[in-house]
């Protein structure tokens, strides 16, 4: 799949970048790859990754997706791009929405444009459930990032570069997520702070996130959006599961929802479900390839609009306490934290 190819990962020192590199190294995929380029802003994280991985095929590029020239330079002779660079903290983006716009929208446009100009074969854009029916700045910026990618796909149907989107639910134990917060609170003998006990979130592992991107890479066509079917849990059950795993007696304290938070998340809208293809573990949402010449569609007729329920963390499979414990105990992060407890 990647034999003698050059890959670029934007935001490559983040959770996804570390996870996909771990997969490539563990499965010995990297021996067939020509080069993997890690593009990010943080030189310290790059240095840490360089020392930890110590692999000559992994190259590091300091730059910011907000700066077109830096991403264009890194894109030279690249075959495939995984675009993971983003601002993803919901409350932070609420206070600094222009920063979300600059990174998640304008930065994404720079990546997509550079990929087109440099004739990259395929670009996988990493999005989020918060882009569906968005109510916060982060979700809105990611929704527009998706629109940029699909618009590029629509305009590049006959060109070389293929653009696909993947949407994540909550990636467990990723940087800035709630699981590391709860574990730190347990270890420091503090109250576990829960925003709203009945709030539900999809539960994906970092392994799942890599599987989703690689599936989209292998099977995605121009303008496809891919979503992995995922179970969900309430935040309270998640906290209690970690209490049980770490044998903790810490109290749970409810603090109320934060800026921009939703009670539940949607991975596929009802409008998208009407045209989605069920692929077993995944949904594929094909691009609407029509152009602006609507007159011909009135002549041809339109497909009947199907009314389907959106796919949400409220109507997906809901895990009970023991099931959440089992899921958490399979995470490398939780296993490491247990060893160090």
Curated annotation (Swiss-Prot):
CDD domains: UDP_invert_4-6DH_SDR_e. Its EC number is 5.1.3.2. One of its GO terms (molecular function) is UDP-glucose 4-epimerase activity. One of its GO terms (biological process) is lipopolysaccharide biosynthetic process. It is an enzyme of class 5 (isomerase). It catalyses: UDP-alpha-D-glucose = UDP-alpha-D-galactose. Keywords: Isomerase, Lipopolysaccharide biosynthesis. SUPFAM superfamilies: NAD(P)-binding Rossmann-fold domains. Pfam families: Polysacc_syn_2C, Polysacc_synt_2. It comes from the Bacteria. Belongs to the polysaccharide synthase family. PANTHER family: UDP-N-ACETYLGLUCOSAMINE 4,6-DEHYDRATASE, UDP-N-ACETYLGLUCOSAMINE 4,6-DEHYDRATASE (INVERTING). This is UDP-glucose 4-epimerase.
């Amino acid at each position: 799949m990647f034999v003698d190819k050059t890959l670029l990962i934007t935001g490559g020192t983040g959770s996804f970048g570390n996870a996909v590199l771990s997969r490539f190294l563990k499965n010995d995929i990297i021996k067939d790859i020509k080069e993997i380029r890690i593009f990010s802003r943080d030189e310290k994280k790059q240095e840490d990754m360089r020392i930890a991985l110590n692999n000559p095929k992994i190259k590091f590029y300091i730059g910011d997706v907000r700066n077109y020239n830096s991403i264009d330079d890194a894109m030279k002779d690249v075959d495939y791009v995984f675009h993971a660079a983003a601002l993803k903290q919901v409350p932070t983006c609420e206070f600094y929405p222009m920063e979300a716009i600059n990174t998640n929208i304008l930065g994404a446009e720079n990546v997509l444009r550079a990929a087109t100009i440099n004739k990259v074969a395929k670009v996988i854009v990493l999005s989020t459930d918060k882009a569906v029916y968005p109510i916060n700045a982060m979700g809105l910026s990611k929704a527009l990032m998706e629109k940029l990618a699909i618009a590029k796909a629509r305009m590049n149907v006959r060109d070389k570069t293929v653009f696909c989107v993947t949407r994540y639910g909550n990636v467990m134990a990723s940087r800035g997520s709630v699981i590391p917060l709860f574990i730190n609170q347990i270890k420091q003998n503090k109250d576990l702070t829960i925003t709203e006990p009945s709030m539900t979130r999809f539960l994906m592992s970092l392994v799942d996130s890599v599987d989703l991107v690689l599936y989209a890479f292998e099977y995605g066509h121009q303008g496809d959006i891919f979503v992995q079917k995922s179970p969900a849990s309430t935040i309270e059950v998640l906290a209690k599961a970690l209490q049980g795993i770490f044998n903790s007696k810490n109290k749970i304290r409810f603090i109320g929802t934060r800026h921009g938070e939703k009670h539940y998340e949607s991975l596929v809208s009802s409008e998208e479900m009407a045209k989605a293809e069920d692929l077993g573990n995944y949904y594929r949402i094909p691009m609407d390839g029509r152009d602006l010449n609507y007159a011909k569609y009135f002549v041809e007729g339109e497909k009947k609009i199907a009314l389907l329920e959106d796919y949400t963390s409220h109507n997906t499979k809901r895990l009970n306490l023991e099931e959440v414990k089992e899921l958490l105990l399979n995470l490398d992060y939780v296993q490491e934290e247990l060893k160090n407890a």
